[in-house]
């Protein structure tokens, strides 16, 4: 079997998914109501009128959330190795070691740039 024939089903699936997503966006943009107003430009406050001045959300919370996601994904990638560590041998260990070292270097760079400092 030719290599491309093995992926025809996947390519069709991705193509249909992209088509449906783009079609939904286009239909919403073309048929949706376009009534900009002052109320739509105000920040959402759980259905209540905004009280007081609007304050910017500190970016540091966003950075902490991104770091959490980064290391959460790391654990998700390391989980299969932890389950089958005995069967992977030296090459599996070296692959996981390289992956962990790469993430550790990224963590050190973030630390060096001061991302972890709370101002």
From Swiss-Prot:
InterPro entries: NAD(P)H_OxRDtase_bac/plastid, NADH_UbQ/plastoQ_OxRdtase_su3, NDAH_ubi_oxred_su3_sf. It holds the Pfam family Oxidored_q4. Keywords: Cell inner membrane, Cell membrane, Membrane, NAD, Quinone, Translocase, Transmembrane, Transmembrane helix, Transport. It catalyses: a quinone + NADH + 5 H(+)(in) = a quinol + NAD(+) + 4 H(+)(out). GO terms for cellular component: NADH dehydrogenase complex; plasma membrane. The keyword Zinc does not apply. NDH-1 is composed of 15 different subunits, Nqo1 to Nqo15. The complex has a L-shaped structure, with the hydrophobic arm (subunits Nqo7, Nqo8 and Nqo10 to Nqo14) embedded in the membrane and the hydrophilic peripheral arm (subunits Nqo1 to Nqo6, Nqo9 and Nqo15) protruding into the bacterial cytoplasm. The hydrophilic domain contains all the redox centers. Belongs to the complex I subunit 3 family. This is NADH-quinone oxidoreductase subunit 7. It comes from Thermus thermophilus (strain ATCC 27634 / DSM 579 / HB8). The gene is nqo7.
């Amino acid at each position: 079997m030719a290599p491309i024939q093995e992926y025809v089903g996947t390519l069709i699936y991705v193509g249909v998914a992209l088509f449906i997503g783009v079609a939904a966006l286009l239909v919403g943009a073309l048929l949706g109501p376009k009534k900009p107003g002052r109320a739509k430009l105000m920040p959402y406050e759980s259905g209540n009128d905004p009280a007081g001045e609007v304050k910017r959300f500190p970016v540091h919370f966003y950075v902490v959330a991104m770091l959490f996601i980064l290391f959460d994904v790391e654990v998700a990638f390391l989980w299969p190795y932890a389950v089958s560590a005995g069967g992977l041998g030296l090459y599996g260990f070296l692959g996981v070691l390289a992956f962990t070292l790469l993430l550790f270097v990224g963590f050190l760079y973030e630390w060096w740039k001061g991302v972890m400092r709370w101002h």
